[in-house]
Amino acid sequence: MVDMTQLQAIYGGTFDPVHYGHLKPVEILANQIGLSKVIIMPNNVPPHRPQPEATSAQRVHMLKLAIADKPLFTLDERELQRDTPSWTADTLQAWRQEQGAEKPLAFIIGQDSLLTFPTWHRYETILDNVHLIVCRRPGYPLTMAHDADQQWLDRHLTHDVERLHNRPAGAIYLAETPWFDISATIIRQRLERGESCAEMLPATVLDYIREQGLYC
C-alpha cells in the first residue's frame, strides 16, 4: 500500500507580496495529490527576475501572516540567508541530503516555468532529487520549444499520482489546478494607484502592507 502521508513539496518564489494566487491553487493541489506539507521558500536574489520591492524581513512577515491559520504550510528562510543567487538545483540537492534518499519529495512550479526549465542552472540534476509538480497556466502550450527538451519531458511525464508517493524523485506531473487571475505585479500597481485589492490577498497581509507603507 502506498503511504499517502509522506509526500512533501517546496514552493519557491519572491512573494512580493504573497497573495491568493499563490496559496489557493497549492491548497487545492495538496488535496488532489495528497501532499502532507508544503514548504514555502522565499527567494533572496532571484537569478532571472528583478529584485523584490519589500525587504526580506517584510516578505517573511507577510508570509507568516498569510499561513498563520494554514497548517499545510511551513516557512523555510534558508535562501534569505544567502548573499548569492538562489539556484533551485542547489537548494533541492541540500533538501534531499537532509531528508534522506528514500523520502518522496517534490518541487512545485507553474507551466510557464516548465517551458523554460531546460535553461535553469543545472536543471538536469533537479529530477535526481525531486519530482516536479506543474500547475497549469492558461495560454501556455503543453509542448517544449525544442525536440530534445520534449523528449526529456516525455521520458519523465506521469499521470499516476501514486508514482509521486512510491518513488523518491524523477517524475513530472501536470496538475489540474484552477487559475486565479492574480499577480503580485497587479497588486503592487493597484496599491500604487490607491485602488482596492482586498479580494486578492489575506486581510492581515493587506493591513501590514498599509502599516509599512509598501508599494505606494
UniProtKB/Swiss-Prot annotation:
Kindly give the Pfam families that the UniProt entry links to this protein: CTP_transf_like (PF01467)
Q: In which pathway does it act?
A: Cofactor biosynthesis; NAD(+) biosynthesis; deamido-NAD(+) from nicotinate D-ribonucleotide: step 1/1
Keyword check for Transferase: yes
Q: Which InterPro entries match?
A: Cyt_trans-like, NadD/NMNAT, Rossmann-like_a/b/a_fold
EC numbers, comma separated? 2.7.7.18
A GO MF annotation of the entry reads: nicotinate-nucleotide adenylyltransferase activity
**Which reaction equations make up its catalytic activity?**
nicotinate beta-D-ribonucleotide + ATP + H(+) = deamido-NAD(+) + diphosphate
**Can you cite a GO biological process for this protein?**
NAD biosynthetic process
Provide this UniProt record's keywords sorted from A to Z: ATP-binding, NAD, Nucleotide-binding, Nucleotidyltransferase, Pyridine nucleotide biosynthesis, Transferase
Record keywords: Magnesium included? no
What SUPFAM superfamilies is this protein classified in? Nucleotidylyl transferase
Matching NCBIfam families? cyt_tran_rel (TIGR00125), nicotinate (nicotinamide) nucleotide adenylyltransferase (TIGR00482), PRK00071.1-1 (NF000839)
Q: What does this protein do?
A: Catalyzes the reversible adenylation of nicotinate mononucleotide (NaMN) to nicotinic acid adenine dinucleotide (NaAD).
**According to its UniProt record, which protein family does this protein belong to?**
Belongs to the NadD family.
Kindly provide the name given to this protein in its UniProt entry.
Probable nicotinate-nucleotide adenylyltransferase
**Organism of origin:** Klebsiella pneumoniae (strain 342)
